[in-house]
């Protein structure tokens, strides 16, 4: 008689095991060769609570690791991305899409019913019916509403601006009579952000308006608000100075933006940026590049909305004295040592001319002889 066979677990047989995820283009990097880490049955789906295959990858070397959060069946059922859970057709949240298409229906509550619900719909999706046909039967007006919602751009959308980038065609297509918007601070496009704008205070400056002092409650102006002086951008007399000193560097201003801004004036030898000290040193390879940058900035610049002060560097070498001054200091040192020696010899001569100096013998403590501590008693002598 053959041994009894173990009953096959139907729920375990329905666990997902796939070789490729269903992810939108925004979650994937531009490089077509993406390295992904696959983990079978790594976590449970957030919708159907079934174990599924997790995929992890990085869009960039400095980006955070992305991963899939729902299984492939639920992603196909919802027609959304496994990572960001946005609709694949319109790029909108699935809650907004279902509300516009009037496809919101109460789903199962318990974990067993969710697994059964996902298994049944997985069979329907494989057969090409079910949820796939439901999206095709939706109202055309509702789909048009979703298209308009998807095309509406907010005030600031970072991914789209990064993908498009600056183009020369768009600049040439602008009419000549359009007003030219210039920054109220200096060089650089975009609004200027200050510490007051981040805190929401109406007064300009770094001080608080309720403080009473020598300025009668008025805040002291910041470094960026003080107008630069000509000595900040005029070339110094020393031709060896080829560095610029930049102050006002914020914590979120990356170093590569400073490098990109100053590279257009000439080749850089090095760039030292200290976000803790809120300053940076830009060392140019040639004096002409440093002079061009200083003349263009005129003591101030705006990079990504961050106002900066630009001035010439002032190196302080250890040996900045000329040869005559060094020789003068050396002669003064030798004369001081000679005077000390002469003073000691004079004191010795005065002592020799007077009374002869008698050397006093040193007093030594004499140790007692051995046996002096023994006491002799008459009773012990035998008398």
From Swiss-Prot:
Belongs to the SLT11 family. Associated with the spliceosome. Coiled coil: none annotated. It is found in: Nucleus. One of its GO terms (cellular component) is U2-type catalytic step 2 spliceosome. Its main location: nucleus. PANTHER family: PRE-MRNA-SPLICING FACTOR RBM22. Involved in pre-mRNA splicing. Facilitates the cooperative formation of U2/U6 helix II in association with stem II in the spliceosome. Binds to RNA. GO terms for molecular function: pre-mRNA binding; U6 snRNA binding. The gene is slt11. Pfam families: RRM_1 (PF00076), STL11_N (PF21369). InterPro entries: Cwc2/Slt11, Nucleotide-bd_a/b_plait_sf, RBD_domain_sf, RRM_dom, Slt11_RRM, STL11/RBM22-like_N. Residues 206-216 have a biased composition (Gly residues). This is Pre-mRNA-splicing factor slt11. Residues 242-315 form the RRM domain. The keyword Nucleus applies. The keyword Transferase does not apply.
């Amino acid at each position: 008689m053959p041994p009894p066979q173990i009953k096959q677990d139907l729920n375990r047989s329905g666990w997902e095991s796939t070789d490729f995820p269903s992810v939108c283009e925004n979650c994937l990097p531009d490089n077509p060769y993406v390295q992904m880490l696959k983990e079978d049955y790594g976590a449970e789906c957030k919708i159907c609570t079934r174990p599924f295959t997790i995929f992890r990858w990085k869009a960039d070397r400095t980006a955070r690791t992305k991963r899939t959060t729902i299984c492939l069946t639920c992603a196909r059922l919802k027609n959304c991305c496994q990572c960001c859970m946005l609709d694949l057709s319109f790029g909108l949240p699935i809650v907004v899409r279902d509300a516009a298409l009037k496809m919101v229906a109460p789903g199962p509550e318990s974990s067993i019913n969710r697994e059964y619900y996902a298994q049944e719909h997985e069979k329907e999706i494989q057969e090409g019916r079910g949820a796939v046909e439901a999206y095709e039967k939706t109202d055309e007006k509702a789909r048009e509403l979703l298209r308009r919602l998807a095309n509406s751009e907010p005030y600031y959308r970072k991914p789209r601006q990064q993908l498009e980038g600056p183009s020369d065609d768009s600049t040439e297509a602008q009419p000549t009579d359009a007003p030219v918007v210039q920054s109220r601070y200096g060089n650089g496009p975009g609004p200027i952000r200050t510490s007051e704008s981040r805190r929401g205070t109406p007064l300009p400056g770094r001080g608080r308006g309720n403080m009473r002092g020598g300025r009668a409650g008025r805040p002291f102006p910041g470094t960026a608000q003080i107008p630069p002086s000509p000595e900040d951008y005029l070339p110094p007399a020393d031709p060896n100075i080829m560095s610029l000193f930049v102050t006002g560097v914020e914590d979120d201003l990356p170093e590569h933006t400073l490098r990109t801004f100053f590279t257009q004036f000439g080749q850089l030898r090095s760039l030292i940026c200290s976000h803790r000290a809120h300053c940076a040193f830009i060392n140019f390879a040639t004096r002409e590049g440093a002079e061009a940058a200083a003349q263009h900035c005129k003591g101030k610049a705006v990079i990504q909305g961050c106002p900066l002060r630009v001035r010439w560097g002032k190196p302080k070498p250890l040996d900045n004295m000329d040869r005559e001054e060094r020789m003068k200091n050396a002669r003064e040192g030798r004369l001081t040592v000679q005077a000390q020696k002469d003073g000691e010899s004079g004191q010795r001569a005065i002592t020799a001319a007077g009374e002869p100096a008698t050397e006093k013998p040193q007093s030594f403590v004499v140790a007692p002889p051995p046996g002096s501590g023994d006491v002799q008693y008459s009773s012990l002598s035998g008398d």
